[in-house]
Amino acid sequence: MKVSVVITLAVLGVMFVWASAAELEERGSDQRDSPAWLKSMERIFQSEERECRKMFGGCSVDSDCCAHLGCKPTLKYCAWDGTFGK
């Protein structure tokens, strides 16, 4: 009985190490590919929708702020206007 438990635990240990190694190998290939992927996604990060001129202050009207931000009149800074979506 003890021998079968030891053998079972040894097999489970070997399977765990094998699965972990396979996962690390797969994750490693993702990390090698990610810089190229990020460069191809560059146009998304530089879209017009994300360009904010007055994100942290200096606004005078709501149109100075980014989407979903509104100009707070007391301190003249952009803050969330409470809306969702595009």
Swiss-Prot record:
Taxonomic source organism: Chilobrachys guangxiensis
Molecular-function annotations in GO: ion channel inhibitor activity; potassium channel regulator activity; sodium channel regulator activity; toxin activity
Leader sequence segment: 1-21
Key words, A-Z: Amidation, Disulfide bond, Ion channel impairing toxin, Knottin, Potassium channel impairing toxin, Secreted, Signal, Toxin, Voltage-gated potassium channel impairing toxin, Voltage-gated sodium channel impairing toxin
Name assigned to this protein: Kappa-theraphotoxin-Cg1a 2
Principal location listed in the UniProt entry: secreted
GO cellular component, one term: extracellular region
Note: Negative results: does not show effect on Kv1.1/KCNA1, Kv1.2/KCNA2, Kv1.3/KCNA3, Kv1.4/KCNA4, Kv3.1/KCNC1 (all expressed in oocytes), voltage-gated sodium channels (Nav1/SCN) (from DRG neurons), and in a range of voltage-gated calcium channels (expressed in rat DRG neurons). In addition, does not show significant toxic symptoms when injected into mice and into cockroaches.
